[in-house]
From Swiss-Prot:
This is Mitochondrial transcription factor 1. The lineage of its organism: Eukaryota, Fungi, Dikarya, Ascomycota, Taphrinomycotina. Belongs to the class I-like SAM-binding methyltransferase superfamily. rRNA adenine N(6)-methyltransferase family. Disulfide bonds: none annotated. Gene3D superfamilies: Ribosomal RNA adenine dimethylase-like, domain 2, Vaccinia Virus protein VP39.
């Protein structure tokens, strides 16, 4: 079963060529009302084909959970590509009721519209308790072998700090097997505005290297499925000369658009990022890891040998252990890889004075 394409005229949000069945909303507060949505279905179709994700799923049993699709451009694209058994759509904006109800009808009920906001965590409990979302839970053995083959999460995230906070929480929950992580190694696809994109993808040597980007590298396998040249240029500008010379700084998108990837209603330049949970490392304490990353990233330009003192009295005695594990302790903290942070954390877990890591107040650097 294939759904008809949604053309720009039918998806535009108050644009100059809009047919008028949608109206300008009163954008407010922390909600998906601040989410822009993709209007170019051809681009979405092409990104999915290039991703080759179809082979990763059992379509006959697959559930797609989609947040803030707007009029359903991405809903149509995802449904046509994966042909899932169930496609649950979280969209609270009443203005999109007609196009979403139409998709529910055309899909013979396989698309289910839930009139709730995916920005709020209570929504996910509601759809789970009501059995609207009822995927199989992976066993630990299955998680060692592959990501979840029957559940995919897709979302347009809000712009500004709200979007950054949401993607940071997604990473926290997937790493701890909370939220959708309770079902196993769940893959997420996110259309992100430019600011959260740069924060999420900025790797070692990036001037604003964040806890969010370290968590992405440490706990997920990630790819950029689609990005514009302008977003890639902004990302490149944030790297030091040393990082550009010594490390792979480009996310190597599968699809690069020469023009901004247009969204409505905010005309934002979007990037499509894929993240999939890695198998859990039972030897790692995630709270200790998070504390260490937050503390050390407050002094990105300082060498590890000097910033180690922030981790507790006598922590410098651990430096030889770091060196033995291949970590360059004279390297600025901002150049450490996620693997370096993981190694440091496992060593410090055995350190008797690490308790203070959970008690200090560290400025949020997500």
């Amino acid at each position: 079963m294939k759904l008809p394409k949604i053309l720009y005229d039918a998806a535009a949000f108050g644009g100059p060529r809009s047919t008028g069945f949608v109206k300008i909303l009163n954008l407010n507060g922390r909600s998906s009302y601040k989410s822009s949505y993709l209007v170019n279905q051809n681009l979405m179709d092409e990104a999915l084909v290039k991703s080759n994700l179809l082979k990763e799923y059992n379509s006959e049993k697959m559930t797609i959970l989609e947040m803030a699709p707007g009029p359903g451009v991405t809903t149509t694209s995802l449904f046509n590509y994966f042909q899932p058994k169930s496609h649950v759509v979280l969209e609270s904006r009443e203005v999109f009721s007609k196009p979403l109800q139409k998709l529910c009808t055309l899909s013979d009920g396989r698309i289910k519209w839930v009139h709730q906001d995916g920005y709020y965590w209570q929504t996910y409990e509601d759809v789970y308790v009501s059995k609207v979302l009822d995927p199989r839970i992976q066993t630990e053995e299955e998680q060692k072998l592959s990501p979840h083959r029957e559940l995919l999460f897709f979302a347009h995230l809000p712009h500004g700090y709200a979007g950054l906070l949401f993607v940071s929480q997604i990473l926290d929950f997937l790493s701890a097997r909370d939220w959708l992580g309770i079902f196993g190694r769940v893959r997420v696809l996110l259309w992100l505005p430019c600011s959260p994109t740069v924060t999420l993808l900025g790797s070692r040597g990036f001037s604003k290297r964040s806890k969010t980007s370290v968590f992405r590298e440490a706990f997920t396998d990630s790819r950029v499925l689609a990005a514009s040249e302008s977003t890639l240029q902004k990302l490149c500008m944030g790297y030091s000369k040393e990082a550009k010379e010594n490390y792979q700084i480009s996310p190597n998108p599968l699809l690069v658009s020469p023009t901004p990837i247009t969204s409505e209603p905010h005309k934002e330049d979007l990037t499509l990022v894929e993240m999939c949970s890695k198998p859990q490392d039972k030897q790692l304490s995630i709270p200790v890891f998070e504390s260490i990353v937050r503390i050390l990233l407050t002094c990105k330009a300082t060498s590890l040998s000097k910033s180690i003192y922030y981790l507790g009295p006598g922590a410098e005695t651990l430096l030889p252990s770091f060196t033995q594990c291949g970590i360059n302790i004279d390297m600025p903290v901002g150049l450490l890889s996620a693997a370096d942070f993981l190694t440091i954390s496992k060593i410090i877990q055995k350190y008797p004075f690490k308790h203070h890591l959970h008690l200090g107040t560290i400025i949020e650097d997500s």
